Amino acid sequence: MNEQYSALRSNVSMLGKVLGETIKDALGEHILERVETIRKLSKSSRAGNDANRQELLTTLQNLSNDELLPVARAFSQFLNLANTAEQYHSISPKGEAASNPEVIARTLRKLKNQPELSEDTIKKAVESLSLELVLTAHPTEITRRTLIHKMVEVNACLKQLDNKDIADYEHNQLMRRLRQLIAQSWHTDEIRKLRPSPVDEAKWGFAVVENSLWQGVPNYLRELNEQLEENLGYKLPVEFVPVRFTSWMGGDRDGNPNVTADITRHVLLLSRWKATDLFLKDIQVLVSELSMVEATPELLALVGEEGAAEPYRYLMKNLRSRLMATQAWLEARLKGEELPKPEGLLTQNEELWEPLYACYQSLQACGMGIIANGDLLDTLRRVKCFGVPLVRIDIRQESTRHTEALGELTRYLGIGDYESWSEADKQAFLIRELNSKRPLLPRNWQPSAETREVLDTCQVIAEAPQGSIAAYVISMAKTPSDVLAVHLLLKEAGIGFAMPVAPLFETLDDLNNANDVMTQLLNIDWYRGLIQGKQMVMIGYSDSAKDAGVMAASWAQYQAQDALIKTCEKAGIELTLFHGRGGSIGRGGAPAHAALLSQPPGSLKGGLRVTEQGEMIRFKYGLPEITVSSLSLYTGAILEANLLPPPEPKESWRRIMDELSVISCDLYRGYVRENKDFVPYFRSATPEQELGKLPLGSRPAKRRPTGGVESLRAIPWIFAWTQNRLMLPAWLGAGTALQKVVEDGKQSELEAMCRDWPFFSTRLGMLEMVFAKADLWLAEYYDQRLVDKALWPLGKELRNLQEEDIKVVLAIANDSHLMADLPWIAESIQLRNIYTDPLNVLQAELLHRSRQAEKEGHEPDPRVEQALMVTIAGIAAGMRNTG
């Protein structure tokens, strides 16, 4: 274990040293000394030296405005480098990676050792594997793309430096390159000056595909195939690619007025353009590689006399011409030119697949399997995974927008006001119209801009090549009519196929009603005919936690899934649960393997569909090797969950969860909604007001510009509490509820739940992780610097609650200290705290100065504002999850 850490530690200190030299060259010895002093004080403050903690606070309070930015940047950049070293560590032979691709092998061995599972059953489970990762542009991806590229290169240098056999001159060359990269990062502004547009966000997503997934996915499939051959003597069929990528960037318009129908149309074209670009590079390689002459009669018939001399090349060159023509047409469309579609325009995956697969079959038949299974196989798998659209997109819109559009329409038609009808009347109207052959939208109707936007979006979906849009997600879905309304709007737009429409249930009440809503829908004959035995439902993690606290929300999510699984099973419907998880614990984030095994039995039968949030995309898919490791983890977890499902919880456990849920929700809402001091305390003790100024994502932080906590999006709500280290949304209410159940004499039952029920043990594990990242002395310091004295008692009360909560969680989990079973994560948090603490202290100081200036009617000092932005980004890097 310790060897593992020492490799990580030595890389971290080496990168820190290079950063120090860079700072000295850029700003002189005195700034470096300042930074070093602060680092040493922080280290001994962490070790429990109170005098040094006091000195740390004084030193940071007394920095001049000129010193603020360099000090903030030094610690922030250091944390980015530490994260890079840790990311490398997770794939390095000395680090975690020694164990990750092995996940699949370990899972297969575990499954083979179960007497009740035949090899055939395991094969069938592999064949029905389905993993769809939905990339979302979260404003929380704070790091700029420019810096991400540099960090990828730093990673490559670390990898080469690990090679024991490199010559001295190579070692010196690599160190020089590292110095250059770290200097480039230091002299680059880490904060974006402008908010990214939705198109910028989509380009960020394409960059992830190009830099990592394009190579990572075929590598993962080779790894999977190797393990299956070794353990089951089973070869993956060429056409079997269980992983797909979808994106919300450019498709998610919920609360984001910047994502319009035109933007979605543009992103769809851009995505296809990027796909032609990447496939052209692949085909170029194949043109030079596939110079073979021998071919099957089928292939020769396909190429005719003209191509007989070099049949494979001939087909590849043809495909290359089609790709080039397609790319040129897409480029013209992106510039706004209207051109007729060229001969051979590629719109469907089959058009890419057929010539490539014909070559593959011919090479195999002619004894050239070794060639067929090289680059050609990788390209075939990319066609299955990415294809013509590159990534498909989801459209997401809030339910009320559809209701308002239909209300405006029915008023215009003089048949009443749809918005004020009862649910039964709405359903009757919708089903009648869905069954009708005549159009509903009048020709000369001029709807309002909002309604026009909803109709235009449906038009874009109807015109897009089939297969480029994956699903229509309805946020804040509450009733069956919410789902039927979207089907009607799509029908009116002339859509020619059954588009999956997924209701998203995201508040406590909506989760509790989810099963009723779906049961009603499945009882409608027209609806059953439309969906052809398949239904997708999305479970919202972040909004339900913000609404009711984590304990109540996670139990509601579990119960909703459990009920939906049983209802769909009874109705013979294949259910795909779509999980809207975030990177942070308050938004449902948990280590993948634990999270999947803690879901109700049967929840992964229809495959896994899950959102991957901005900042987590980089940690999980930032490099091809990490992609292989993340996909392997998911694969192992899905196989295990489907073949060895977790137990059904005992009735007594369910009753305890009901009780925990009620107590924790009451306490959580008692503070967040009913305590009149809470909102003023939240606004002053966290950088919530200042966060709005950060040019992070393309969507506004609030659903409505005025309003309290409930109008704040889930992301800034959690982000703000992560910054001041109280981490409140991720624990408030949970420990108090546990304590109450312990006092009722049920501790041994809770211990049994922790031991034998993955759902419950994952809950507790996530609480431990949050407590390990929280820091009460820092939260208290924010209060002293920023909060009105009258509100101090509330802060004290919340901190005392957290201390009590930690005790009860440790007692139930039977641990002496936090994260006892995950020492690697505990180590990583400790390593970063030394650098995150000064940023927290500095942030409190900067907020104090900035608010003081505002109070006195002065413009805030730009140096203070800039340094504040840097601390926000730095703490996010230190906490490894933002919102």
Swiss-Prot record:
Any single Gene Ontology cellular-component annotation: cytosol
EC number: 4.1.1.31
Single GO molecular function: phosphoenolpyruvate carboxylase activity
Record carries keyword Transmembrane helix: no
GO biological process, one term: carbon fixation
Catalytic function, reaction form: oxaloacetate + phosphate = phosphoenolpyruvate + hydrogencarbonate
A Pfam family this chain is assigned to: PEPcase
Cofactor(s) required for function per UniProt: Mg(2+)
Gene3D superfamilies listed in its UniProt record: Phosphoenolpyruvate/pyruvate domain
Alphabetized UniProt keyword annotations: Carbon dioxide fixation, Lyase, Magnesium
Annotated active site: 138, 546
Keyword NADP belongs to the record: no
Function statement: Forms oxaloacetate, a four-carbon dicarboxylic acid source for the tricarboxylic acid cycle.
Protein family (similarity comment): Belongs to the PEPCase type 1 family.
NCBIfam families: PRK00009.1
Name of this protein: Phosphoenolpyruvate carboxylase
